[in-house]
UniProtKB/Swiss-Prot annotation:
One of its GO terms (cellular component) is Golgi membrane. Residues 258-268 have a biased composition (Pro residues). The keyword Membrane applies. It holds the Pfam family PRT_C. Belongs to the MCTP family. May be involved in Ca 2(+)-dependent signaling and membrane trafficking. Plays a role in fruit dehiscence. Components of the machinery involved in organ development mediated by the receptor-like kinase STRUBBELIG (SUB). Collaboratively with SUB and POQ, regulates cell growth anisotropy during gynoecium development, thus linking together cell-cell communication and cellular growth. Together with SUB/SCM, links RLK-dependent signal transduction and intercellular communication mediated by plasmodesmata (PD) to regulate tissue morphogenesis. Observed mainly in flowers, and, to a lower extent, in seedlings, roots, shoots, leaves, stems and inflorescences. Expressed in the vascular tissues of roots, cotyledons and rosette leaves. Accumulates in roots meristems. Ca(2+) 2 binds at residues 351, 408, 413. This is Protein QUIRKY. It comes from Arabidopsis thaliana (Mouse-ear cress). Residues 154-198, 238-323 are annotated as: Disordered.
Amino acid sequence: MNTTPFHSDPPPSRIQRKLVVEVVEARNILPKDGQGSSSAYVVVDFDAQKKRTSTKFRDLNPIWNEMLDFAVSDPKNMDYDELDIEVYNDKRFGNGGGRKNHFLGRVKIYGSQFSRRGEEGLVYFPLEKKSVFSWIRGEIGLKIYYYDEAADEDTAGGGGGQQQQQQQQQFHPPQQEADEQQHQQQFHPPPQQMMNIPPEKPNVVVVEEGRVFESAQSQRYTETHQQPPVVIVEESPPQHVMQGPNDNHPHRNDNHPQRPPSPPPPPSAGEVHYYPPEVRKMQVGRPPGGDRIRVTKRPPNGDYSPRVINSKTGGGETTMEKKTHHPYNLVEPMQYLFVRIVKARGLPPNESAYVKVRTSNHFVRSKPAVNRPGESVDSPEWNQVFALGHNRSDSAVTGATLEISAWDASSESFLGGVCFDLSEVPVRDPPDSPLAPQWYRLEGSGADQNSGRISGDIQLSVWIGTQVDEAFPEAWSSDAPHVAHTRSKVYQSPKLWYLRVTVLEAQDLHIAPNLPPLTAPEIRVKAQLGFQSARTRRGSMNNHSGSFHWHEDMIFVAGEPLEDCLVLMVEDRTTKEATLLGHAMIPVSSIEQRIDERFVPSKWHTLEGEGGGGGGGGGPGGGGGGGPYCGRISLRLCLEGGYHVLEEAAHVCSDFRPTAKQLWKPPIGILELGILGARGLLPMKAKNGGKGSTDAYCVAKYGKKWVRTRTITDSFDPRWHEQYTWQVYDPCTVLTVGVFDNWRMFSDASDDRPDTRIGKIRIRVSTLESNKVYTNSYPLLVLLPSGMKKMGEIEVAVRFACPSLLPDVCAAYGQPLLPRMHYIRPLGVAQQDALRGAATKMVAAWLARAEPPLGPEVVRYMLDADSHAWSMRKSKANWYRIVGVLAWAVGLAKWLDNIRRWRNPVTTVLVHILYLVLVWYPDLVVPTAFLYVVMIGVWYYRFRPKIPAGMDIRLSQAETVDPDELDEEFDTIPSSRRPEVIRARYDRLRILAVRVQTILGDFAAQGERIQALVSWRDPRATKLFIAICLVITIVLYAVPAKMVAVALGFYYLRHPMFRDTMPTASLNFFRRLPSLSDRLI
């Protein structure tokens, strides 16, 4: 065993960190004093230190502007500390009837949200409830920041306890000071005294997957006292992947004196490793030193498994030393040089001026200027922003400049320019206010100035910022013609409604009189809304009045702004040729909206003949069109706002809210997504003489919000570092992120080439722990006709920020998944599939009209529009999923078979004892069963998934797929393959259908045998069964039930020496019962 001597503790640090909480104001707090007001004060609790502000007398919008400072005992673990801020109403300033200070709200902030001094800003936090039944409103404005200051050794070592004691004295009443001091001396001795305390026994610290199970006292103890030796058992990843010593251990103490032998070098940013490499540390009393045992363990799917990456972005679980860039703390800040060019004035005569922007690394030109009507050409306007990549080293270079010059597009003559020193360009970081544009005098060479060719001013602003800047989404990164298709963009899906059309009755129809005898006219109503159409069944005729009745519902999908018209056509289909009897056009915007099941009155609409423009409500004379009167039709129309219009597959749906906003419930949290970048993308196109290239961008979809990152051109390892947020209304939803190759940026308006899919991932929100950052790398997998192919990897950081209390989140699990109308008036499965296809087309058409457009192929891929297509591979995957679900039953049957065969006599005897206890005390059966489930859940906690799972190729049966099955999966409908190929596939499908047919027949036969027990199809078998049942009845009446249960159980568990290898008499009796199989033709 190799041993390594321990090192002595490092000297105490002379740097002390302070946390400052500036309580600014509160707004719209709840009145609690019984007189319509509140006298509020704030209590701040951090690291066992409490402080309070002054009380503001009777003010619902109090302003404090008070600063409270706290000592940070462990700066390295500050990100995991909690800052509790509570607002109370002071009972002393009330009406005298209160016994305690009333609670007005609370805010809980984690240390990862603290900012360094100089980067803080005023942030308003909504006040939260303490319990489900609390009534809280309002918000509180805070400034929170920290700073480090120098402190002497006494202050750093022993001043913490004294300062904490003083803070406790400041908050608590004087009568509690003595008790507090005694309590602190008892449980928090100074460090000088702690060094003399002998250890009672070695502590046991288990570090598992980034979680530390250790008391706070033991953590403080390890900082000042030498620990026993450490034996480390580590499961490391494969050799080609490195893991640093501090990965996935956010709570690990960096000052720990023990060091394992030969530690690997620390990982660099962006390094990846398989999750989870498990490290367990057990402290034992052995000689100094430690052993390391490495066990290589590969993930189940190899290179197709998601991995944890170590990033500089920080956020929680991958690194300890991180900087918070609130609220964009999931991605790395990328600096850009922003140049906003607004307009110019007093320019020399020109036709179409433009601006050139030049640095040492970039050269771009603006679009041609726009001159307002009525203004001279010497005052052009551009209103354009450029975002050029910038590094700190660019500003540090001596003489680095930014040149902005104006030029005449027709003659390419120089109109003047401005030069900036990059070292003097200001740095802007939101929430700083935007820099106001300023006028700069255009300059040129000395000859140009003397000749008068250079004149005028240009209005612009220059600053250095990051991708957080509000000007970044609309900024131009280059002057290429296709730059509009490379910008980032946020889209919103259209608001979709279900349009319910109830066709009731039609009167005064002009039916042809020359019908054959005894022939009833076949009258149908066809409804059409855009590309959607539906037709009713044959109407029933009333012989007395000559009217036709249907009472049939048709449902369509209508999208805002509701500009379409609903067209109703009454057709006579008695003959082969359909005859139009009349039509009516109804604007969708005029249809009544409802959000519940209330009754909507019907209206009569006039039917018009050829040339009519529309039908209005009323009687025969109430039409407003220009065509002849052809009858009238009674309709009940309404826009259903109580349904959720499904445009996604139900199993990957990201939103279940109804259309009507009045029915929305408050959000339960915020989903934050940081799209870091991609690695190892494959070439998707060839340009510049056959050189492979990829122009990748990402699309993320959750709820009604779509986001699109900017396109990184000609890069196989693009880095986006863009962060987006969504409000979460239901945790049982799915976030979808896709990667595409941009083809539209190279095509003109006449040649619209679709973008190529690279891959996508799905993350279910319910699998994320609250307020925890997951920074992972997921493989991008695409199923091609040649098989499964890995197109690269995407790196994302995701966090489900859940500020609400736990009951608010858990209450969502007990609520219905879909809105109320889906259960009161449910829609059929086939009808939902048709409506989903229509909704997908409408969303795709809506997003295709945006700039830059989101292509229909992108929308269909993100919405899984082809998820219901036939595939032999999917059928096999679903079959094995069923087998996996029933595996527990198979395992239980095998376990019982091993028990009854006495494979393990000790276990069988224990089962006998447990069976006796349960039979004699039947009240313990149900509690024992639930206790067993609890134990199973606790046991499987060790094997819980540590990161959100990605696409599983083994579950999808995509590892080894038959080429012909893949070709069949990608075949169109109707098929485009040769007849002999289709015939071979049909024969193969028939063979599979025979197996299914046989299994269904066997199931039916077993059920029919059960029915034959009392159906007298076999008289002798029925007589025997009735006689056996009579004997069992007499025995159960005469013998106690417990005795019968014990006898049956012991008979079932009897030793194999008392068994017969032949089937039992009861099984033979059941197999001899007749079924209906012999009656099949």
